[in-house]
UniProtKB/Swiss-Prot annotation:
Gene designation per UniProt: purM
SUPFAM superfamilies: PurM C-terminal domain-like, PurM N-terminal domain-like
CDD domains: PurM (cd02196)
Principal location: cytoplasm
Pathways per UniProt: Purine metabolism; IMP biosynthesis via de novo pathway; 5-amino-1-(5-phospho-D-ribosyl)imidazole from N(2)-formyl-N(1)-(5-phospho-D-ribosyl)glycinamide: step 2/2
EC number: 6.3.3.1
InterPro entries associated with the record: PurM-like_C_dom (IPR010918), PurM-like_C_sf (IPR036676), PurM-like_N (IPR016188), PurM-like_N_sf (IPR036921), PurM_cligase (IPR004733)
Name used for this protein in its record: Phosphoribosylformylglycinamidine cyclo-ligase
Source organism of the structure: Paraburkholderia phytofirmans (strain DSM 17436 / LMG 22146 / PsJN)
Annotated GO CC locations: cytosol
GO molecular function, one term: phosphoribosylamine-glycine ligase activity
Length: 355
């Protein structure tokens, strides 16, 4: 039987397609892996088994833990990335990515052990991606965790050229008996506030709207640096000073001040019937937040539920331990203030109020 003949095809004699023709450059991906290996190597710590490049990353829970509980967190950098694209500034968003997850797992008493990242783009720019990952590795060094693996996804047509998205994943461990969950917080306890380094990584949709309205010169001097650098200051990582504090002080609760600001994050560690009363005079409002409020016409209540307003981490300790905690944190290089007290809630009252 004669086999059917295929229809004439104008591409029969044309050169065959490659993955690069479709927009995916395998060689660029390989070049990125080679570029970032030295950064990842600097983050290695006890527990890491093997190197980068395997199908899965291996980590052995440190033997110092008798009843280890694993604590995981994941987050991104949000629309702060849009400002990074506008400014062509990619060296700080990697630290932002790490900070958002390691600070989250820290509040339950966990020591960050390892971190993985996800970098997605339409067309891979090796230089830009390497700069981002270098920042991720720096964040891992600051938090004492290993950059143990990650994924770079080049997806043509999904993102405009020059743009990318990030996601990060942190895993830590805490002794089961030392989990911090806020259950011991009681009236009379003191709320300490640790200074933020700036806006951190939340509220940037409003920040960008304010910039759009005010049309400032982002290169102009602002409090000793450019306004652009002030806006893009990387999220502070609190891991090492707070882990050290936990070795000496009974920390009752912590809240990473992210989306929702002080008034929505502190209640996450308070049991029903308790309110954190914060005194707005208890800490200085950094100039950048005053600038945002002025140029955006943002109400005080909105500022407190969108931005960290200068406090990146809240720590609850007993009144008897407050001064010692401040001394230890200050000695570790942190700026810290007594910003409030815990009391019983009035009927129908919110669990965090700023007075």
């Amino acid at each position: 039987m004669n086999q059917p003949k295929s229809a004439p095809n104008s591409t029969d004699s044309a050169q065959g397609l490659s993955y690069r023709d479709a927009g995916v450059d395998i060689d660029a991906g390989d070049a990125l892996v080679d570029a970032i290996k030295p950064f990842a190597k600097k983050t290695m710590r006890d527990g890491v088994l093997g190197g980068i490049g395997g199908f899965g990353a291996l980590f052995e829970v440190p033997k110092k833990y008798k009843e280890p509980v694993l604590v995981s967190g994941t987050d991104g950098v949000g629309t702060k990335l849009r400002l990074a694209f506008q400014l062509n500034k990619h060296d700080t968003v990697g630290q932002d990515l790490v900070a958002m997850s390691v600070n989250d797992i820290l509040v339950q008493g966990a020591e960050p052990l390892f971190f993985l990242d996800y970098f997605a783009c339409g067309k891979l720019d090796v230089g830009t991606a390497a700069t981002v990952v270098k920042g991720i590795a720096h964040g891992c060094e600051l938090s004492g965790c290993a950059l143990i693996g990650g994924e770079t996804a080049e997806m043509p047509g999904m993102y405009p050229d020059g743009e990318y998205d990030l996601a990060g994943f942190a895993v830590g461990a805490v002794e089961k008996s030392k989990i911090i969950d806020g259950s011991t917080i009681a009236p009379g306890d003191v709320v300490l506030g640790l200074a933020s380094s700036g806006i951190h990584s939340n509220g940037f949709s409003l920040v960008r709207k304010i910039i759009e309205r005010a049309q400032p010169d982002l290169n102009a001097d602002f409090d000793g640096r450019s306004l652009a650098d002030a806006l893009m200051a990387p999220t502070h990582i609190y891991v090492k000073p707070l882990l050290a504090l936990m070795q000496q002080i009974a920390v009752k609760g912590m809240a990473h001040i992210t989306g929702g600001g002080l008034v929505e994050n502190i209640p996450r560690v308070l049991r029903e019937g308790l309110t954190a009363e914060l005194d707005h005079r208890g800490w200085p409002l950094p100039p950048l937040f005053s600038w945002l409020q002025k140029h955006g016409g943002v109400a005080d209540a909105e500022m407190h539920r969108v931005f960290n307003c200068g406090i990146g981490m809240a720590v609850v300790v007993s009144a008897a331990d407050a001064d010692a905690a401040i001394g230890l944190l200050s000695a570790a290089g942190e700026q810290v203030w007594k910003i409030g007290v815990i009391r019983e809630s009035a009927a129908g009252e919110a669990q965090t109020v700023v007075v």
